[in-house]
Regions:
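Conserved donor NDP-sugar-binding/catalytic core segment of glycosyltransferases
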Residues: 97-136
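A conserved acidic beta->alpha catalytic loop
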Residues: 24, 39-48, 92
Length: 198
């Protein structure tokens, strides 16, 4: 049986980013079962553009902030019985093999697998530096190297799976995990939703 994947994108007034994101999603090696865009009441032509995209589902709602958009999209994923939700910021451009690699890496032991987010021009530079973890999976505090900011150094010093995620930046989350922990707290309008959910 093939697992079903909902690619969820939340957007607000960033049409040029969104167009590019959708193009990358539509050209994945592993077919996405459905793409859902939650439009937080954009007024830059986003809704009109999305109405021309017949293969993309759209929920237009008042601007409830990013957490409100994620909350709405996750509710949709739960209601429609997807196996996974692939969380994608509208300025994310996943590599062609991203979804295939995430799905192939997922096991019952995982609740979420996240890609690293790379600088588009400097491919070795991590957009979000990753904290160095000690043997107890806690961030290292007393060290010259407390965060990895280059992909090559991160790969050299870490395992295949690392107990850290950049949620909403290409993370694949299982619906079974969402059913256990619940949906995102939609009261975080702009910041804090990722930290709270992680």
């Amino acid at each position: 049986m093939t697992e079903t994947v909902l690619a969820l994108v939340v957007t607000y007034n960033r049409l040029n980013y969104l167009k590019r994101c959708l193009e990358f999603l539509e050209n994945q090696d592993r077919k996405i079962n459905q793409i859902l865009v939650v439009n937080n009441d954009s007024n830059d032509g986003t809704q009109q553009y999305l109405e021309t995209k017949k293969n993309i589902n759209v929920i237009k709602q008042e601007n409830l902030g990013s957490a409100g958009g994620w909350h709405t999209g996750i509710e949709y994923g739960l209601k429609n019985n997807f196996d996974y939700i692939w969380m994608m910021d509208d300025d994310g451009y996943p590599d062609k093999s991203s979804l295939k690699n995430l799905i192939n890496s997922f096991t019952e032991a995982h609740s979420c697998i996240s890609s690293v987010v790379l600088n588009e021009k400097l491919k070795n530079l991590l957009v979000f530096p990753i904290p160095k973890l000690n043997k107890y999976n806690n961030p290292v505090i007393f060290s010259l190297l407390r965060k990895y900011n280059q992909l090559s150094i991160f790969k050299k010093n870490s395992m295949e799976f690392y107990n850290y995620a950049n949620l909403f930046n290409g993370s694949l989350i299982s619906i079974r995990s969402i059913k256990k922990i619940g949906n995102i707290n939609k009261n975080y309008i702009l910041y804090g939703d990722e930290v709270d959910y992680f």
